[in-house]
Amino acid sequence: LPIEIFHWLRHDNMSVFPHLLLVADELAKVTVIEHFRSCSQTAPGFACGVNDLIAGPGANVTYVCAQEWSSNVIALQMNSTVVDHDASAMSLNLHVGAKYSRFESLSRLIGEGGRSDLLAVAVAKDQQEFDARTLQDHISPRTASDLLYKNVLDDRARTIFGGLIRVEPHAHFTDAYQKVRNL
């Protein structure tokens, strides 16, 4: 069963600063779903969240972020994933809320045979703006990463994407991809 975590903005002009530290030890398997929501669909607020995901040797980590802030929230989210040898990490980020949402994702593959999958879906309407920045950092040889972001825009909504794949000189046989689709 997945572990579910809920963060709420309950009042006008409220701020939240959630931090998730997830350490999956050797050969562990875990799924975490983190929800970000507002009690009122018009309440202004500010959210700045951080999560640190660590997949130990042979571990399997699945992380889902469901961001559904109200239409007047400014949201910042920083995600860091470290993948050790023969481990895998999959993160899925769903963005439908907030007036402005900035999402930064760093995935570091530090062990041979590590794999990281970075997936995101953003559905933007009215004048929403979703800004995504990513770095897939291949430090060890024989690692793999795959990024797939899909965006749906309506009205005057905007999405921004900046992604980088870095391969260290000794990280031979790296397999890395990025694809962003907009509709």
Language-model features: locations:
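Conserved beta-strand/loop scaffold segments within soluble protein domains that form the structured core
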Residues: L1-L183
